Amino acid sequence: MPQVKKIVFSKKAAYRLGKIADYIYEQSRSEDLTLAYMGRLQEYMSDVLLRFPEAGRKADEYGKNIRKLVYQGYSILYRINDAKQRIEITNIFRENLP
């Protein structure tokens, strides 16, 4: 597998990141807390996916070649694009587990 050099977000994933930030701000009313959490989320994605692109489990129920990584209750759906040497985040959403 070629080395993955960057992470890109689909429009849907970028929108969902914004909604997650909005939700955290609504709950905390703290811009600092929101920025810190979003920074940790993005740092986690970068640290894990750039070093270990296959860290997520295969999640074909979401589409062909999709993998799923979970961070603090948020599912991160992505695919590995070997030709472009990148990770493509397709969606991020909250797992509402019982």
Where are these regions (language model features)?
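Basic, Lys/Arg-enriched alpha-helical interface segments
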Residues: M1-G63
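Enriched for short, Lys/Arg-rich terminal
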Residues: S28, R67-P98
